[in-house]
Regions:
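Acidic/His- and Gly-rich active-site-bordering loop/insert found
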Residues: 2-4, 20-135, 156-161, 378
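Metal-dependent amide/peptide-bond hydrolase catalytic core
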Residues: 2-3, 26-28, 83, 210, ...
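Ser/Thr/Pro-rich, intrinsically disordered low-complexity segments
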Residues: 6-15
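Residue-level signal for inorganic ion chemistry
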Residues: 49, 53, 202, 242, ...
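Acidic-glycine-rich active-site phosphate/pyrophosphate-binding loop
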Residues: 112-128, 195, 210-222, 349, ...
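Acidic/histidine-rich catalytic neighborhood of metal-dependent amide-processing enzymes
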Residues: 140-217, 424-425
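Glycine/serine-rich anion-binding loops at beta->alpha junctions
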Residues: 113, 130-146, 228
Length: 425
């Protein structure tokens, strides 16, 4: 398939004294740092990360982490690699600073499977105009590259921050969240450090996202008793019992939709998959249902399942030979950061000064690892990154704007300089 070649949008390098809408002017240090962030270096690192693949499910993030680690080490960052499972390492890379609170960046190394139908090899990155194409370009190899090169520019400019700037890159974000769970577990009870804020570099099209819903996967198992369909009363039909539970779930979904949050919408249920029975002429002895529950900030999947199980008992669905069990196989909490938080104001201002125009403040329909940082460590969290979640992430011929990559890196650098600050001479 032939693509029309978009016209690249030049991003002028900001200079000292630049102001946007009355925002604070860029300092000489800020301008010097931003001038060291180049399009060529961002395209090169993003391309290398795309080529490393890391499809998941499959657990193949190791090569991506190796490429990322090599880039961080080449720039002199302190690094730590911890295997969550064989060949599946979390990476922590830090630009050291003083003892003041630092700034945390969060990303993930895995990508969803490429699938079929690509115009070119999904793991051989290519560029057409302003678009860099390849699986993970938007979600989220570009965001990772932008973080690394933002911190590298600060170091190259001989700026010492008052506190650390740290990148945590986890595995398995696209599936069960093994990486972020291992991180939060290993960090207890001391925590992960003193950070003024966390910036998740997922694709937001340079929008400042201050909250997102969480997500939970729930597996429902119903056990009954098989019998000949000519005498169904001799058996206990697991599919029939499961259908009654599904009716409870759908009723709760309707209840949730009646209470819409202006930023995030509402929690929701989705029945994603059903398996049950062994034959048309047999009473179904078993049924399994896979369920997705989108969580509002503060909701807990285990509490939700406990309430549903109580309804099942109240309706006597799990009686007379029917056994019902629920299992939460994955939970990712939602979060919300106040619109007046310092990281929000700083991100909006930095985006304008970095050449990205106005960054609107909004919510996010997807879930991400940032909810764990907010819930487990109480760190104010936003999502801000290059790429279009709705039209590029997880899509055939996924691509990202090179212009957005450059702007995102500049914003990340400005956030370090402004939220953490320079160390005293």
């Amino acid at each position: 398939m032939t693509r029309p070649a978009p016209v690249p949008v030049p991003v002028p390098v900001p200079v000292p004294g630049d102001t946007i809408r009355g925002d604070t002017a860029l300092s000489e240090t800020e301008s010097r740092v931003l001038s060291l962030i180049t399009e060529e270096s961002i395209v090169e690192l993003t391309s290398a990360l795309i080529a490393a693949a890391g499809e998941n499910p499959g657990g193949t993030e190791g090569e991506t982490v190796s490429v990322l680690h090599a880039a961080c080490a080449a720039h002199g960052f302190a690094t730590d690699i911890t295997d969550v499972a064989p060949g599946r390492p979390n990476l922590v890379a830090t630009l050291p600073g003083g003892s003041a609170p630092g700034l945390l960046f969060l990303g993930h190394s895995d990508v969803v499977p490429a699938g079929e139908g690509w115009s070119l090899d999904p793991f051989t990155p290519s560029r057409t105009g302003d678009r860099l194409i390849g699986r993970g370009a938007t979600d989220m190899k570009g965001g990772l590259a932008a973080i690394v090169l933002a911190l590298a520019a600060i170091k190259e400019a001989d700026v010492t921050l008052a506190g650390p700037a740290t990148l945590i890159c986890t595995v398995d974000e696209e599936d069960l969240g093994l990486g972020i769970r291992a991180l939060t577990k290993s960090a207890q009870p001391e925590g992960i450090g003193d950070f003024t804020a966390c910036v998740v570099a997922e694709p937001t099209d340079l929008q400042t996202v201050i909250g997102c819903r969480g997500d939970a996967y729930i597996e429902l198992t119903v056990q009954g008793r098989s019998a000949h369909s000519g005498r169904p009363s001799d058996g206990r039909n697991a599919i029939s019992a499961a259908s009654k539970i599904i009716a409870l779930i759908l009723a709760d979904h309707a209840r949730l939709q009646a209470n819409q949050d202006a930023l995030l919408g509402a929690g929701s249920w989705n029945i994603g998959r059903i398996e049950g029975g062994d034959g048309t002429s047999m009473v179904a002895a078993d049924c399994r249902v896979w369920i997705d529950r989108r969580l509002m900030p503060g909701e807990n999947a285990h509490e939700i399942v406990a309430a549903l199980a109580a309804q099942v008992r109240h309706e006597k669905i799990d009686s007379d030979g029917i056994v019902v069990t629920f299992e939460v196989t994955m939970e990712m909490p939602g979060f919300r950061t106040g619109a007046q938080s310092s990281v929000v104001a700083a991100t909006v201002a930095a985006t304008a000064q970095a050449g990205g125009g106005e960054s609107t403040i909004g919510g996010w329909s997807a879930a991400c690892d940032g909810g764990f940082i907010d819930r487990e460590f109480g760190i104010p969290t936003i999502v801000f990154g290059p790429g279009d979640l709705n039209h590029q992430a997880h899509q055939i011929d996924e691509s990202v704007s090179v212009t957005e990559l450059v702007v995102a890196a500049r914003v990340y650098a400005l956030l370090c300089l402004r939220l953490v600050g320079e160390a005293a001479a």
